[in-house]
């Protein structure tokens, strides 16, 4: 049940650490590793706030005879050291995607390598398919952290080349298969404290509207309350620290924003994106708390960042987002950009007031001890000499110099 030319020699692997969710794919992989590689398997299940009971994953691993089982609560680390640094950059991939899956992979990979060192494992394995981005994200992270690590990627090795064959293998090996509310095999779902994504089945046709059953973390905007919810978010050096004046830990704060976003129909996205491997894919994403946080962070930046610093930061953001999407979290260029972004956030402290209403997040107020907004300069009333409007004449004259010279030379930018 392998493609021999791609399969690592069985004798080369003694113990492997598997990133294990307890779902169909990784449960099949667990059994496949045991039978194909005849090696000891260590399972690692990361609690990233996916909102599901993780003990079933432990029990499944025990059912397969796994002796070393790790179920680690990484929620605070995930938000503090991965999500918040990314949001300081306002990172958005292709103008829409808030990178909820992408940002989780380097942390999972990092902990896998730590567990491999701890248990003496000589290999790591993941459940990402050979068509997607996650295989790249996992493996780039593995190699950045442990260059000589052996990596097993079952989807690139076995002959279970479809979801149907996977289900057949599961049934033949008495592996429990989850069902959705309709009693069918579920969509391919990834979830953590930042977001959830759904792919596969009817979503593979980009012309088909998703059924409401696809959505797990948000109500529809149409079903949201007719009365707006007003909240405040406090920031310190670019990171959110409080909601409505109550200080919260990073994970608790994001969880609270998720609750607020869900209740107001915020954070749904139906997206066709360009994968790093070259193909387009369609997914349905729900990022309620992250959507609120992005709007709020831009709101506080609007009064605390210098214009040129803000514009430079915005110009760097697409590259930064692409690095995370493509799996280069541990790259020197990402760290370099992060240093510049973090430098820009030193003055990004203050409070943003927001209105949440039927899928919308609207900034309705912002204040900061570091505000660069000067009422006496911008007022339409008497500024008492704070700004001499005559100065604008020379400014415009200098700015227009190259345009006037081009016109004199007969090289007008457009026809008259």
UniProtKB/Swiss-Prot annotation:
Group of enzyme by EC: ligase
Annotated positions binding ATP: 19-27, 46, 127
Associated pathway: Amino-acid biosynthesis; L-arginine biosynthesis; L-arginine from L-ornithine and carbamoyl phosphate: step 2/3
GO terms for cellular component: cytoplasm
Residues that coordinate or bind L-aspartate: 129, 133-134
Superkingdom as given in the UniProt entry: Bacteria
Keywords: Amino-acid biosynthesis, Arginine biosynthesis, ATP-binding, Cytoplasm, Ligase, Nucleotide-binding
Reaction catalyzed: L-citrulline + L-aspartate + ATP = 2-(N(omega)-L-arginino)succinate + AMP + diphosphate + H(+)
Nucleotide-binding among keywords: yes
Coiled coil feature spans: none
GO biological process entries: argininosuccinate metabolic process; L-arginine biosynthetic process; urea cycle
Any Pfam family matching the protein: Arginosuc_syn_C
Annotated binding of L-citrulline, by residue: 97, 102, 133, 137, 188, 197, 273, 285
Protein localization: Cytoplasm
Enzyme nomenclature, EC number: 6.3.4.5
Record keyword Cytoplasm present: yes
Stored Gene3D superfamilies: Argininosuccinate synthetase, chain A, domain 2, HUPs, Single helix bin
HAMAP family assigned to the protein according to its UniProt record, in alphabetical order: Arg_succ_synth_type1
Similarity comment text for this entry: Belongs to the argininosuccinate synthase family. Type 1 subfamily.
SUBUNIT field: Homotetramer.
Entries under NCBIfam families matching the protein: argG (TIGR00032), PRK00509.1 (NF001770)
Name of this protein: Argininosuccinate synthase
The species this protein was found in: Granulibacter bethesdensis (strain ATCC BAA-1260 / CGDNIH1)
């Amino acid at each position: 049940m392998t493609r021999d030319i791609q399969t690592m020699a069985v004798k080369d692997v003694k113990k492997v650490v598997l990133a294990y969710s307890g779902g169909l794919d990784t449960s099949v992989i667990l059994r496949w590793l045991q039978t194909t590689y005849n090696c000891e398997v260590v399972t690692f299940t990361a609690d990233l706030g996916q909102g599901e009971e993780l003990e079933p994953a432990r029990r499944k691993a025990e059912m397969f005879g796994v002796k070393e089982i790790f179920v680690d609560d990484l929620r605070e680390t995930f938000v503090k050291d991965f999500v918040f640094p990314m949001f300081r950059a306002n990172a958005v991939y292709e103008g829409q995607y808030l990178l909820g899956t992408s940002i989780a992979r380097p942390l999972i990979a990092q902990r896998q390598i730590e567990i491999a060192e701890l248990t003496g494992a000589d290999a790591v394995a993941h459940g990402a398919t050979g068509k997607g981005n996650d295989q790249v994200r996992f493996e780039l992270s593995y190699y950045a952290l442990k260059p000589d690590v052996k990596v097993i990627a079952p989807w690139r090795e076995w002959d279970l080349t479809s979801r149907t064959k996977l289900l057949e293998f599961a049934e033949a090996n008495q592996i429990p298969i989850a069902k959705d509310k309709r009693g069918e095999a579920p969509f391919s779902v990834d979830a953590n404290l930042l977001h959830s994504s759904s792919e596969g089945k009817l979503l593979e046709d980009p012309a088909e509207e998703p059924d409401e059953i696809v959505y797990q973390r948000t109500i529809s905007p149409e079903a949201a309350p007719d009365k707006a919810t007003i909240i405040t978010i406090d920031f310190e050096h670019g990171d959110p620290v409080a909601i409505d004046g109550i200080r919260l830990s990073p994970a608790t704060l994001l969880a609270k924003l998720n609750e607020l976003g869900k209740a107001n129909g915020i954070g749904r996205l139906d997206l066709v994106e360009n994968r790093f491997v070259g193909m387009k894919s369609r997914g349905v994403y729900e990022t309620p708390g992250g959507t609120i946080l992005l709007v709020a962070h831009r709101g506080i930046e609007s009064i605390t960042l210098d214009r040129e610093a803000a514009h430079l930061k915005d110009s760097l953001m697409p590259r930064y987002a692409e690095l995370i999407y493509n799996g280069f979290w541990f790259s020197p260029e990402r760290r370099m950009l992060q240093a510049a972004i973090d430098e820009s956030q030193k003055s990004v402290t203050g409070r943003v007031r927001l209105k949440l209403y039927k899928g919308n997040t609207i900034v309705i107020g912002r204040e900061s001890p570091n505000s660069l907004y000067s009422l006496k300069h911008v007022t339409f009333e008497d500024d008492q000499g704070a700004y001499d409007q005559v100065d604008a004449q020379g400014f415009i004259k200098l700015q227009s110099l190259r345009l006037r010279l081009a016109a004199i030379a007969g090289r007008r930018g457009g026809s008259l």
